[in-house]
Amino acid sequence: MIKIGNIELSSNVILAPMSDVTDLEFRKLVKRFGAGLVVSEMIASRAMIMKSRQSMQKCAIMHDDPTSACVQLAGCEPDVIAEAAKMNEDMGAKIIDLNFGCPAKKVVGGYAGSALMRDEQLAAKIFEATVKAVKIPVTVKMRIGWDDNTRNAPTLAKIAANSGVQMVTVHGRTRCQFYSGNANWDFIRTVKEAVKIPVIANGDITNFAKAKEALQRSGADGIMVGRGVYGKPWLISQIAYYLKTGKEKPAPSIAEQLDIITKHYDAIIDYYGKSVGVPIARKHIIWYSNGLPSSAEFRCTVNLMKDPIAVKEKIAEFYMSVMDANK
């Protein structure tokens, strides 16, 4: 089983950090479906040390489980990232993850995210400063490189490991690919061969078969699932079961899905409040209902609704209609 420092994961299937997706309530939900580790949304380190409302909300964690208390930080200033890491440790974080993989122009333009892969000396300073600042494990998530001519993930992983970083996750694309083409799981094997710390494969892992193939081709210790869980938080459980038994675990029934989405919806409203919670919940409602009969009409209706009680009633009405149609 994977160990990050002295923290042992119960599963080698991990939830990826995703901006505006992996908030506290979504992480709680996916953790209940058996994720070995759940990671917060990316948090800008400078905003963190300034204690902006948004950054403080993003770093909220579950204190009862160290594998639910992993906070991802982004930035390019070693001292600022180190200070933000220490702040999170003081607030209860058990793992700090460093973002060296985000390809977004806004992030890269600030010389953070995957832009850091272009400056190995700066990367080393960030690793060293962060590891020195905290007593908890530090991990990093990166891409295979900036472009096809600079696929330096193996080198950067070595620098990270030599600096005391305890786990490396690699998304199998370059920054210049963004999310186009296919994830190069084979290249991740070169990272695995370069270091002795755990290596996690990420990218295009959307079902059982791809999860198994990613592990086999990469030789990685585990996999990280991202966009595949949109509307399917139970996918983590299905993948873990398949990797363990070789058997496919069915998705929840429509009735069970209604229960999941209703509880998730209630949690969002309780956490964010009505005015903020409803817009946040809408994107999850869209993902949950995708592919169900008459879901397009349902989504159009919900997107125009603002009253939280009315939205909840509409969710129940829609899922009941799907169940009736299946009788």
UniProtKB/Swiss-Prot annotation:
Signal peptide: none annotated. The active site is at C102 (proton donor). FMN binds at P17, M18, S19, Q72, K141, N202, G203, D204, G226, R227. Its EC number is 1.3.1.-. Its cofactor is FMN. One of its GO terms (molecular function) is tRNA dihydrouridine synthase activity. Keywords: Flavoprotein, FMN, NADP, Oxidoreductase, RNA-binding, tRNA processing, tRNA-binding. Pfam families: Dus (PF01207). It comes from the Bacteria. InterPro entries: Aldolase_TIM (IPR013785), DUS-like_FMN-bd (IPR035587), DUS_fam (IPR001269), DusB-like (IPR004652), tRNA-dHydroUridine_Synthase_C (IPR024036), tRNA_hU_synthase_CS (IPR018517). It catalyses: a 5,6-dihydrouridine in tRNA + NAD(+) = a uridine in tRNA + NADH + H(+); a 5,6-dihydrouridine in tRNA + NADP(+) = a uridine in tRNA + NADPH + H(+). SUPFAM superfamilies: FMN-linked oxidoreductases. Catalyzes the synthesis of 5,6-dihydrouridine (D), a modified base found in the D-loop of most tRNAs, via the reduction of the C5-C6 double bond in target uridines. PANTHER family: TRNA-DIHYDROURIDINE(47) SYNTHASE [NAD(P)(+)]-LIKE (PTHR45846:SF1). Belongs to the Dus family. This is Probable tRNA-dihydrouridine synthase. It comes from Rickettsia prowazekii (strain Madrid E). The gene is dus.
